[in-house]
């Protein structure tokens, strides 16, 4: 219950940052979905916005709450993107994302956005990325076992993501996901560049130098971590 309330606090604060007429990137995952619902509530108060969804699941939810959607190729900007994260390294605001399988579209929308706002509960703060979760890597199906071997050569332990049925998980782009356990990543920037150079890799879940604001929800309030490294606190519920 405490974690859900923390997420709700962060999501509602993020939704309050959206101004009338904005084009908003809508992230994927349980925390981002709370922000989508909060934006839907604001529509009843007269807020006008256009959403760009990062997954089919998010798009379906946005439509249900009344948010008008556009394709990323039909907009000339994204004013603000709101998304969650699996891990946030507090000093650099580096992110590890992709457990929901939408990392490629999330990264594209995050890069398009003039401002990227990340919402998490305080359990997602880590001293080093990769300390708690494996790094998702999206690869083309053709030759994926070779991609796994090359990731092993980099010190990772890749596992093909599968559904409960045992069938391989497919991203909305039709690709496979390798969850690669590296442990605490000593040099995220090097790993970022190196994995992207592997043939067959579409992208991975390291989002470095992208977050402008991280909203950290807790049982007592929220904490704001900004790119400038300044930190403020509020007990807004």
Curated annotation (Swiss-Prot):
Homodimer. It comes from Thermomicrobium roseum (strain ATCC 27502 / DSM 5159 / P-2). HAMAP family: Rib_5P_isom_A. Pathway: Carbohydrate degradation; pentose phosphate pathway; D-ribose 5-phosphate from D-ribulose 5-phosphate (non-oxidative stage): step 1/1. It catalyses: aldehydo-D-ribose 5-phosphate = D-ribulose 5-phosphate. Keywords: Isomerase. CDD domains: RPI_A. GO terms for biological process: pentose-phosphate shunt, non-oxidative branch. This is Ribose-5-phosphate isomerase A. Belongs to the ribose 5-phosphate isomerase family. Its EC number is 5.3.1.6. Substrate binds at residues 28-31, 83-86, 97-100, 124. It holds the Pfam family Rib_5-P_isom_A. The active site is at 106 (proton acceptor). One of its GO terms (molecular function) is ribose-5-phosphate isomerase activity. The lineage of its organism: Bacteria, Pseudomonadati, Thermomicrobiota, Thermomicrobia, Thermomicrobiales. It is an enzyme of class 5 (isomerase). Catalyzes the reversible conversion of ribose-5-phosphate to ribulose 5-phosphate.
């Amino acid at each position: 219950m405490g974690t859900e309330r923390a997420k709700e606090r962060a999501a509602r604060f993020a939704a309050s940052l959206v101004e009338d007429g904005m084009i908003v990137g809508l992230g994927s995952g349980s925390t981002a979905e709370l922000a989508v619902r909060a934006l839907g509530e604001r529509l009843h108060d007269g807020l006008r916005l256009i959403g760009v969804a990062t997954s089919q699941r998010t798009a379906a939810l946005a439509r249900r709450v009344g948010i008008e959607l556009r394709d990323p190729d039909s907009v000339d900007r994204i004013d603000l993107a709101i998304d969650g994260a699996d891990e946030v390294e507090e000093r650099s605001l580096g992110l590890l994302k992709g457990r929901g399988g939408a990392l490629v579209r999330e990264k594209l929308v995050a890069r398009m956005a003039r401002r990227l706002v990340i919402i998490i509960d305080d359990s997602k703060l880590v001293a080093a990325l990769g300390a708690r979760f494996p790094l998702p890597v999206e690869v083309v199906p053709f030759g994926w076992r070779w991609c796994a071997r090359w990731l092993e050569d980099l010190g990772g332990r890749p596992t093909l993501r599968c559904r409960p049925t045992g069938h391989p998980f497919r991203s909305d782009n039709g690709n496979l996901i390798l969850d690669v356990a590296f442990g605490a990543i000593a040099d995220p920037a090097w790993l970022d560049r190196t994995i992207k150079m592997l043939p067959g890799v579409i992208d991975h879940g390291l989002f470095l130098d992208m977050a402008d604001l991280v909203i950290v929800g807790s049982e007592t309030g929220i904490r704001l971590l900004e790119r400038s490294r300044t930190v403020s606190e509020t007990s807004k519920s």
